[in-house]
Design a protein with these regions (language model features):
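Flavin-dependent oxidoreductase catalytic cores
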Residues: 1-164
Length: 164
């Protein structure tokens, strides 16, 4: 099998990828809120860029802290107001700085776990396209139009945050 274009640059919109090698999403995006995990996590993702990948993707980053969170323990913040938590903003931004330093494109995997949600605290619930019970035995509420609009907005706001 030949991959004639694997190492050729590729233009996607305004972004040029130096090649077509893309790393799968790695690490939880907000794990860098934990100072003890930062250096290892940065080095893990930076190594892919340094090694020649054209694109490195920061892993699972929840778009809100109510019904999107799959793994507990991250400090909630408002994606619309990065100035309110400059430590997290700078820590997340360091991913992009380290990846781009080696000529790779930096992306983030923005997620909403939907019906797979296991509520960890008050005010959290699982929501999905239909009412059901998930594999963990949690009752999932069917999303209404307000939920859909809110979640779409959360994706847009968190995407803007990641682009800053």
């Amino acid at each position: 099998m030949k991959f004639e274009h694997l190492f050729a640059p590729m233009q996607v919109g305004k972004v040029t990828y130096r090649n077509r090698i893309v790393s799968a999403p790695m690490a939880f995006g907000l794990i860098v809120q934990n100072p003890a995990a930062r250096d290892f996590t940065y080095r893990k993702l930076e190594a892919s860029a340094k090694g020649g990948n054209g694109c490195v993707i920061v892993g699972e980053t929840d778009v809100n802290f109510t019904d999107a969170v799959r793994i507990p323990g991250f400090r909630p913040f408002d994606f619309a107001k990065p100035e309110e938590d400059p430590e997290t903003f700078d820590a997340v931004g360091e991913y992009a700085r380290r990846i781009k330093r080696h000529g790779a494109v930096a992306l983030a995997e923005l997620v909403h776990c939907g019906k797979e949600k296991v509520p960890f605290g008050p005010g959290q619930e699982a929501i999905g396209p239909i009412e059901t019970t998930n594999l963990a035995g949690v009752k999932v509420r069917a999303m209404n139009e307000d939920d859909m609009a809110r979640v779409a907005h959360d994706f847009a706001v968190s995407a803007t945050y990641m682009q800053k």
